[in-house]
Amino acid sequence: MGKVKIKKKETRIDMTAMSDVTVLLLTFFMLTSTFLQKEPVQVITPPSVSEKKVPDSKLMSVLVAQDGKVYLELLGTKDSTLKSEDLREAVLKKAVAKYNATHTNKVNLTAKHVEAFRKSNAFGVPISNMTKWLDMPVDERDKALKTAGIPIEENFDLTRPTEFQIWVQAVYDALEDAGAADDMKKGTGIAIKADAGTPYERVQVVMNNL
């Protein structure tokens, strides 16, 4: 007697629902994640026990490299009051105007320079070299930052501000114009990120310049 052959049924797994869930999860993470911004130099901070979170808006971050070079990063408001790009543009124009008022070697910005600065996450070159830096391709700009830094020294005479103090005042004025300077007035809108190997004396100079 011959064996009865049982017809094998084709197994089919419907992945439609799983695909939908995957898309939803990817969308969620894209909308809620905070992407790490590229910094001009690597700054390895020392361990901290502070439970205070660094604000993610209306913030001026001061990066202090191990060799003492200083850079700035700016974040605007979360809403459309003063976006980060608009804040950078306003700060650049104000800083250059303040610099030109006390220096004979004037800096002349073009629309191209302003647009390039709007897209720059971090910056830190002498103002006199700003246009030259902004004229560089992005990858060359990144390399140039590593050997530059914002000029800063101990100074308590605000009638003759350091370039770092010019930038700080420009940031405050730009936020004040937008009605968003409260955090900076209270000090919560300023963050200093220094490398674990940065001499404390250098960090103290930065704090004294604020």
Which residue ranges define each predicted feature?
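Long, low-hydrophobicity, acidic/polar, solvent-exposed interaction domains
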Residues: 36-210
